[in-house]
Amino acid sequence: MQLPIIKMLKKRSQIEVARLQDEIVQTVYSLDDRAVLHGGTAIWRCYSGNRFSEDLDFYSTSLFSLKTDFEKTSRSHGLIVNKFKSTGNLLFSSISDGRTSLNLEVNIRKKVESIVRPYLNADGTSLQIRTLSAENMILEKIHAYSDRRFIRDLYDIYHLLQFVENKGSVKRDISLFLTHLDSPVDEGVLKTIIYSGVSPSFERMKVDMARWAK
C-alpha cells in the first residue's frame, strides 16, 4: 500500500506546496469540471509519479469567465490570489496560502481530448479529475524537452511509458525523438526532485526508451 504523499516528501516546503495544490485543484473543479490538468503535477498526482512538481497547468475554456468566482472561492478557503494576467491564449496567476505560493497557468483557448483519472491528494485520498492520456502527455513532454532540454521532462517521458495503452500511437514519435536526443542541460537536478527510489541517469533512460520503442 502506497504511503500518503505527505509521508514521503522530505521537505516541509514541498509538503506545504502539495497541500496548496490540492486546495487549488479542488477549487478549479468545483467551478469547471471540464478543466484538464496537464504537465508535471498531473503526472505526479494522476500517474503515480515520484517526481515533485510545483506549478499547476490546466486547459480550460471556461475559467477565464469564472475568474471572479475563482477568486471568491479561493478567498473563502483563506487563499490569496494575485491579479490574473492574460497573454491572449494563457491566463496566469500566483496563489498563496500565507505560507507558500505557486503559479497557476491556464490555456483558455486550446481544446484537448481528456480522460478521467484519480488525482492523488497529499493526504492519500483521491479526486476524479480530467487529465491527458499518457500518450498525449508524452507528446507534450517531447515538445518540452526539445525546447528546453530539462531533465525533468525526459524523466516524465520515461516514467509515462509504463502507462501507454496504445503503443503504436507514440512509438514513432519516441523513436524519432531518440534519434535527435541531446543531453540535458541540468542532469544533476533530477536527484533533488525524485523523492522516492533511484533517479536514473540520462544514458539509462535513453537505453530503456530505445528498447521500449523497438
Language-model-derived ranges and their functions:
Residues 37-42:
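Glycine-rich beta-strand-to-loop/alpha-helix junction loops that act as flexible
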Residues 1-35, 46-56, 61-214:
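Structured mid-to-C-terminal alpha-helical surface segments
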